[in-house]
């Protein structure tokens, strides 16, 4: 990703050395503007089976230049989840994009940390520090682990390091990019912490004026572990999660293949 707009990079393990040398570590790209200004963090792939966020993050790294302030981008927020895909879903291992420089190949990963890196799942996952109980498999879901645990499992450690990065760099805005099935109630939507509602409302109006139909949802205060809740509660950042639809996640879909991932078109939807 060496591009003109990138002014530096570092590893997430700088904020938790226990991640170094593991698949929980990942690269953070930095794009500094010509003048001082606010800072923003983009989490590209919390769930690597949701490729639009990955492509958005890569596009920022490869093509974005910053005039004022600093942009931080993590294209592979859950790096371990790129090393496998979800069992019994018949998902493709890769998808390909045709570009002016030739064909580019990208990994279609999993929603969760690889069990080779974190096993076994408990029967019940207890989120820290809220004490909320969730299904045991959610222990490998990066978006159920915030604000993280320094001596926790790999997923909790990655969440902890991202939270510490936000605190250290005094990140003003954090955007977490996602996809979901068309039947999921929160799609084509932004979910914002109460501290970020004014920001998200202004963004929504701008997007609708540009012809993008999107809704705004408040972050549930009692649903814990998610970026839009915990990063707003435990740091000073303004967190917003963005969710778009793709039938490749849907329960009603037909063949799960590369064409479906890329086009988002399925005859059953």
How should these model regions be labeled?
Residues 33-39:
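Proline/glycine-enriched tight loop/beta-turn segments at coil->beta junctions
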Residues 1-30, 63, 150, 154-269:
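C-terminal accessory segments enriched in acidic
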Residues 33, 44-48:
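Glycine-rich His-Gly loop
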Residues 56-69:
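A short, Lys/Arg-enriched amphipathic alpha-helix followed by its capping loop at the start of a domain
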Residues 47-55:
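Di-metal (Zn2+ and/or Mg2+/Mn2+) metal-binding site signature of metallo-dependent hydrolases
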Residues 39-45, 141, 145:
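Short glycine-rich or small-residue beta-strand-to-loop segments that form or flank ligand, phosphate
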């Amino acid at each position: 990703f060496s591009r003109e707009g990138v002014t530096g990079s570092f590893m997430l393990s700088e904020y938790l050395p226990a991640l170094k040398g593991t698949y929980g570590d990942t690269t953070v790209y930095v794009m500094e503007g010509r003048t001082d200004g606010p800072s923003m963090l983009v989490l590209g792939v919390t769930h690597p089976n949701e490729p639009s966020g990955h492509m958005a993050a890569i596009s920022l790294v490869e093509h974005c230049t910053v005039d004022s302030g600093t942009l931080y981008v993590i294209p592979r927020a859950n790096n371990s989840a790129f090393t496998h895909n979800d069992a019994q879903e018949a998902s493709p291992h890769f998808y390909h994009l045709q570009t002016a420089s030739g064909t580019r190949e990208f990994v279609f990963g999993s929603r969760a940390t690889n069990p080779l890196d974190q096993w076994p799942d408990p029967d019940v996952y207890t989120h820290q520090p809220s004490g909320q109980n969730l299904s045991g498999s959610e222990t490998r879901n990066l978006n159920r682990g915030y604000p993280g645990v320094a001596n926790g499992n790999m997923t909790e450690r990655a969440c902890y390091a991202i939270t510490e990065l936000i605190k250290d760099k005094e990140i003003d805005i954090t955007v977490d990019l996602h996809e979901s099935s068309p039947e999921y109630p929160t799609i084509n939507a932004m979910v914002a912490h109460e501290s970020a509602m004014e920001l998200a409302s202004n963004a929504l109006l701008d997007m609708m004026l540009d012809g993008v139909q999107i809704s705004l949802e408040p972050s549930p205060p009692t649903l814990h572990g998610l970026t839009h809740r915990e990063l707003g509660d435990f740091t000073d950042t303004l967190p917003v999660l963005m969710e778009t639809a793709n039938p490749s996640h849907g329960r009603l879909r037909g063949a799960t293949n590369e064409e479906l991932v890329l086009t988002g078109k399925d005859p059953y939807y």
